[in-house]
Every structure is written in C-alpha cells, then in structure tokens.
Amino acid sequence: MSGNNGWHETFDLVVLGAGAGGMTAALVAAIEGQRTLLIEKSDRIGGTTARSSGTVWIPDNRHQHRLGSSVDPQAARAYLDALVDGRADRSLREAFIDVGPRMIDYLEAHTDVRFQAYAHSPDYRQDLVGATDGGRALEPLAFDGRTLGPDFDRVGWPLRELMLFGGMMVTRGEAARLLRSARSLDGFLLGARLVSRYIVDRLRYKRGTRLVLGNALAASLYKNLRDRDVSIWLNARTSRLVNENGRVRGLLVDIGGSERRVAATRGVVLAGGGFPASAELRERFLPRPVAEYTAAFEGCIGDTFSLAQDVGAALGPPGEDNAFWFPSSVARRADGTTAIYPHIALDRSKPGLIAVNSAGRRFVDEASSYHEFTRAMYRSHREVPSIPAILVCDRRFVWKYGLGMIRPLTPTLGSFVDRGYLYMADTLDDLASKVGVDAVGLAQSVAAMNEYARTGVDDEFGKGSNSYDRCNGDARQKPNACLGPIEKPPYCAVKVYPTPLGTSLGLRTDANSQVLDASNRPIAGLYACGNDMHSIMGGEYPGPGVQIGIALTFGYIAARHAAQAEIAQRRSDREVRSELS
C-alpha cells in the first residue's frame, strides 16, 4: 500500500460501468487531461448498449442540419414538454437539448467515434406538437473489430437471434436490401460482400468482425479509450464508496482476489445501467405481473444504487411503471438457455398482423412504439388478461416478413412449433384454442382487420395513420402500409411478454449529473449517467435511441463538470495563496 493516505491507486475520475454512458464519461475525462479509471464488474465491455440498435436521439444535431430536415430547438422543447408534462425536472431536459448537439460535435472532433443521420426515424409520439419525421436520431458507422486485436473478444455480443449465420451483423436497412437480393442486383452484391467478409472472419474469430448498431458504438468507444491509455479494470467489483467530510473521495474495489483502495480526487461516475436484470428490484418496483425476462445486460442489477444510497443519495419518485419496455417472445435454445427476442418494428407494424388479449380482442395500435405497445398490454390487463399478448397472422405473412425469431423466407416452421414458440392451425377456432383466447373474439377481430385492410382505415386504433407507423410498414401495401388481411390458412401466432430494456427509476441528479441527497443537495464528488440516473423524461420514450442519447450526453456533462471543478478549485487555491501572501 502506498503512503498516500492509505490509497493503493489515485485517479482523478473513476467510472463504474462500461456501457455507452460510462465509456463516454471516461473518454471525455481522458481528453480533458484527467487520470481516468473505468471499472467493469464483468469480463466484457458494452453493457446493454452492445446488444442494442445503438441509435442516439439528439435533437438539433449537426447531421440533422446536413439532411436539410427542419431543425428547431424550440420544437424539440415543445415536444418533450408535451410528452413529459411535468413528470420530471425540466432543467435536465434543457441541459439535454442544449448540450446534446455539442456532445456529438465534441466526440467527432476529438475521437474516431462517428455517426450518421438515421434519416427515416420518426419520433414515437406523432400525436404531439413538435414531433418530427426524422433527423433527430443518429446511428453509429460500421466498425472494424479487427482493429482491436485480441481485445475484440472483450466486446459484448449482440443478441444471438439478431445475427445471421450465428455471428454476422447487419443493419435494418441492410436486412431490407438482402431480402430483395433475389430480384435486386444491389441486394445480391451486398449479400455477396457481407457473406464473403464473414466467411473470412470465421477462419480466425468466433463471430464476424464487421460491427454495426450498438456493437459498433461500444467497440468504437472502447477503441478510443485504449488509444488514450485509459486504465480499464474488468472483473472488478466495487464494494463501497469512501465518503469523507461530505465528499466522495474514492472507493473500495475487489479485483484479482484482493481489495484495492482507489482514490478519486475529482469524483466517481455511476453508470451501472439501472436494474432491469435484478429479479429482486423488478419485483419491488415494476408493475404486476412482474416481468420475468429481460434482454438487458445481466450486470444491470442496481448495485450502484446501493453504493450511492450508502453515502446519502436518494432515488427519484416512482413513475407509472419505472421501466422502458419491449414486447418480447421467448424460446428455449438447443443448449438449454433462454432466447429473448424483442419485437421492435420488423413484424408488429407490417400489414396482416394483429395483437389480441385473452378475449381475442385487439387492444392497441400494433405499430406503435415498443414502449407504448407494452404499456398498452398492462393497461388492457387491468380489465382482461393481456399478458402475454398474442400476435396473430397467417403463413403468407411469416414467409414475407418473418415473425419474431422466424426470419422471412423460412421454408418450414415445424421446428418452431415443436419448441413451443410458434402456434399454427388450419382454422382460427383451433388457433384460439391452442393459444388460450376466446375463439369468437378472435374471429371478429380478424374479420374487422380484413375490412380495415380493404378500406385502409383502422377505425379502432388507427394503425398506419401516422408517419411512425408507416415508416415501419410496407410501402408496397395499398391503401395503408400497415393494414393487410389475415385470410389464408394456416394461421400463426406467437406470445409476447413485457420485458424491460431499461429502467426509468434511478438516482436523483441535477443538470450537472451530480447525484442528489434527500434534500436535493448535490453530493460532492458523485455523479450518475445513463439509466443509473432517474429518467429525465419521466419514464416517457420520445424517439429511437433516447436512452443512449441521454447516457452519452450526461456522461459527457459529468466528465466536463468534474474537470472544470478541478480548474475552479485550482483557481480558488491560487486566489487563497495570493490573499495569504
């Protein structure tokens, strides 16, 4: 042990959690000249980000300007005000709107992290003032995992069911082009290029090295941390924050079988990803019936909350459901593990599918955002059992669009039926019996949808009536991109369950990312970002990638605030010395 007040190691800033928010905080701190340590309790970096789409929602970003789309910060403010409606501190939203674009500029100026506009990405609540049809969402550019050398294996894997051939990643846009490969030279050439690269990769690696989506963002941040020689401790678990005289001064870390006392002279940033993977905290804070499954990273168990509460931190006020949601289908893999497939947009929005409850009745616009869809499951469940909800279509739909884990153009479906994942029947009555819904209600719901498909208007829930719905539909389908008949047996169904992709209940923070105590006073030296901080949107979900956008922004804010606090302290020290002399 060193003689420096009993500390084994001394850093300026220590960050707990190697997701997008934590890595951004560590990277910005390093750029600002801070001695930085990033601690991750698992053996992989990336957290839930590595499994996500990697989309980053930042209103008024530089790429939105380049698109030529309408850019008005006041429109974003109006949209978020209408959506959140007093459920969260407005000052944090203001910080997000003001700083988010500067954060993107900063990363692209000082690092190799690169984004591009996700042009066709409407905001999720098109019914609210200020919503846009695109430009606020960014996606990371593809990343070459080979540049990480042996550390490529340190990057967390995407969900297996979202990769092709067991290890090849593609974006949504690429997937759409590949489905046209039989009739499109562009799609054929893309497929040939991607598959050729993947075959070569598999001669040396466990999976493809062309990374896209959240895996690309995580790997790019990791590469930039390595390039700046940031200290990264994997398999390291923090047992306690050291609070001296009302300030967090350091922490105790268990690593390699020993305990290390680590000083953090400027502060500690908590970026543990919330608690979606904690069965105990889900039971305590999430609505009934409590979600049994999650596709979030297994390390997101809320242990950073306990660390913070031990030094006086307070949680934010509980919200409607305290989570951000996916509706997911579940199946047992051949190796005995559980596969969880988030139904984000590839099937629910397409023409020829409905979602029903146990009465066989529709309860939602199936093309609504994953968050709103799952909330509708809970609302419906108060009156009629609606968890799980049943997605119903016919065999033609599955062939054309896929259904959950079943990809388009899958020739035979028997294996999915045998695993208990897919339900099939030659009549709607038989299908209703197999999935446990009312047969009369299901028949009436299908008949109503078939009529809506003919007229192009969903009189019940308005499926396909807004730009977000239509963006995820099928433009070839007329008169409504999201409405199609269900009329050719065999009929098919899968069950979907509420699964938290993240949690919205977190530590109270201010606009500087500082963690607050029960009296709303900042705890000196303690910051939080990402889903460790209480939702600045009051649990609402404005658009694609908002969680990562907030995580990056407040990770940036935390690191900059800590660095500027050091500068301010040095200035204060000089002034004191000058006065004393």
Model-found features: residue ranges?
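Extreme N-terminal leader/targeting segments of oxidoreductases
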Residues: M1-L13, I31, N215, A219, ...
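N-terminal Rossmann-like FAD-binding beta1-loop-alpha1 element of flavoenzymes
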Residues: L13-L38
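Conserved N-terminal/central alpha/beta ligand/cofactor-binding core
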Residues: K41-S231, G352-A355, R362, R396-W399, ...
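An anion/pyrophosphate-binding glycine-rich loop and adjacent beta-alpha core
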Residues: Q126, G134, L141-L189, F305-L307, ...
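Glycine-rich loop(s) and the adjacent beta-strand/alpha-helix scaffold that form part
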Residues: G208-N215, D227, I255-A334, I548, ...
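A glycine-rich dinucleotide-binding beta-alpha-beta segment and adjacent secondary-structure elements
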Residues: R240, R247, G441-I536, E540
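Internal hydrophobic alpha-helix adjacent to the cofactor/substrate pocket in enzyme cavities
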Residues: L307-A314, A443, I550-R570
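Helix-rich C-terminal "cap"/substrate-channel and partner-interaction subdomain
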Residues: E383-P490, H561, A565, L580-S581
